[in-house]
Amino acid sequence: MVDWFDNFWSVYSNLVLSLGTNSLLALSIYLTLSCGMLAMANAAFMGIGAYTSSILTMNYGWSFPTAIAAGMVAPAVVAFIIGRPTLRLSGVYLAMATLAFGEVVRLCILRAESLTGGALGLNGIPQLTQWWHVLAAVVLVLFLLARLRRSKIGRAFEAIKEDETAAGLMGIDVNGHKMLAFALGAAIAGLAGVLNAHLTFFIGPQEFGFDRGVEILTMTILGGINSLVGPVIGAFIITLLPELLRSFADYRAVANGLILVLIVLFLPKGLWNPAWLRRLVGLGKKGVTP
């Protein structure tokens, strides 16, 4: 049994830990969606966290805990700076603005070759991420977000998502709560970037582009944003699909786009929708009734 597990872990450890880091990414965009914002900058925030921590551990010998903290603070600060002008937008305009920001980040990474390695990326990043780092991060983020959902802030997020104008008339600081959701989501995406960078040894600008942004959104929309379980389920499915369908690996971006369209059309509340699941179970029971 021990030998089997050792063999399994040596082959699939990166995949298993990627389930955790992708869950963090899905939860990061869940925060902004739960406040009614379609912001697509999470891949860029992941990249900022990954590059910040990698440069600090490789070039300056920072310890892993302090590099994690820096990798979370840096994207949160950037989110605060860009959030002031962009969060005045909504819907597709906000999505376009944040996508443009992601492209700016990618181009900055390409230009700063002496620091980031440019198109070649950073290689030889210390492998400091352990399985318990990922597990602890996912559990802690889930715990904090669960507390947030039940708090006054969480109720304010929900009110803003339902009707921003009405929320403002009720005395809710709409801009302040949007900024909070945006910055917290950026910090969580940065955490995922730190853990992923110190797991895979290598990061490059292509990992944090448009395709990755769509993938993160697909994870969350697929699982559903009515609960914290949904984004995690979506992250697991999107992470495992390429392994199950290796022969279609070249069409991964197409598959993500197709899944996103189908979910929006036929399951707008995602797979983890208790009402839909109850109906599905009810139909199953009727089908087996003699």
Regions found by a protein language model. Name each.
Residues 1-290:
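Transmembrane alpha-helices and adjacent helix-loop boundaries
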